[in-house]
Amino acid sequence: MTHQPQQSPQFFLTAPSPCPYLEGQQERKVYTHLVGDKANEINDLLTQGGFRRSQNIAYRPACEVCRACISVRILAGEFEMTRNMRRVWSQNRDLIGRVHKAQPSTEQYALFRDYLDARHRSGGMSDMTVLDYAMMIEDTHVNTQIIEYRRRGPDSFMSAKGDGELIAVALTDVMADGLSMVYSFFSPHMQERSLGTYMILDHIERARAAGLPHVYLGYWVEGSRKMQYKIRFTPQEHLGPRGWQRFEG
């Protein structure tokens, strides 16, 4: 009899449930726990294989009749902003994104709550408490960080810190080959800033500066309005049966 090493992940399959993206479809997920000394290495490998992370769980769609969820990653080194993206970048030049350890705060939760109530009132995360939020941020064994976006202050040039109100937050995993945007949220009262687009652009610039080739955006679902924004950031790669394939839009 052979024995698996203690650090080898075990995979499980969820029961069918209604798909949050395509009406009338059922979703199932295969998942594993990211724990132990190898959690960071396993998370890297699984993300490169189409998994996403939520707390200490890595999961991937395993639907019986649908293959609509496609993993997407931006080729950071080749990316060029469109005219509209340059406008968004310029419009947010008064913001500073500062990296912090993955620790929750009451200020973050207030913004998170405001975002959910305005944008995802009927979503699966709508009833998350402050303790649920804290677990989303802290319950991890992988290399992750919080990026807080604030307005620049009078001393920002010297300190590289923003001292204004918290406007946007990104929870981001740092991997061997890129940055993975786990979750992000922003003030719903500043639609003119296109903060979701801005944070993706900022992550592309951060990946470039760190010499990392990819920014992982999670899943794109053709036909889902919620997901359409992801294919605007080209060139990118989509994960299919033959591995990662280039996509130009």
UniProtKB/Swiss-Prot annotation:
GO biological process annotation, one example: ubiquitin-dependent protein catabolic process via the N-end rule pathway
Localisation: Cytoplasm
Cross-referenced Pfam families: ATE_C (PF04377), ATE_N (PF04376)
Main enzyme class: transferase
GO molecular function: arginyl-tRNA--protein transferase activity; leucyl-tRNA--protein transferase activity
Chain segments annotated as transmembrane: none
GO CC annotation: cytoplasm
Source species, domain of life: Bacteria
Main localisation: cytoplasm
SUPFAM superfamilies, alphabetized: Acyl-CoA N-acyltransferases (Nat)
InterPro entries for the chain: Acyl_CoA_acyltransferase (IPR016181), Asp_Glu_LeuTrfase (IPR017138), N-end_Aminoacyl_Trfase (IPR030700), N-end_Aminoacyl_Trfase_C (IPR007472), N-end_Aminoacyl_Trfase_N (IPR007471)
This enzyme's EC code(s): 2.3.2.29
This protein's UniProt keywords: Acyltransferase, Cytoplasm, Transferase
Catalytic activity: N-terminal L-glutamyl-[protein] + L-leucyl-tRNA(Leu) = N-terminal L-leucyl-L-glutamyl-[protein] + tRNA(Leu) + H(+); N-terminal L-aspartyl-[protein] + L-leucyl-tRNA(Leu) = N-terminal L-leucyl-L-aspartyl-[protein] + tRNA(Leu) + H(+)
NCBIfam families: PRK01305.1-1, PRK01305.1-4, PRK01305.2-3
Task of the protein: Functions in the N-end rule pathway of protein degradation where it conjugates Leu from its aminoacyl-tRNA to the N-termini of proteins containing an N-terminal aspartate or glutamate.
Family statement: Belongs to the R-transferase family. Bpt subfamily.
Annotated protein name in UniProt: Aspartate/glutamate leucyltransferase
UniProt source species: Brucella melitensis biotype 2 (strain ATCC 23457)
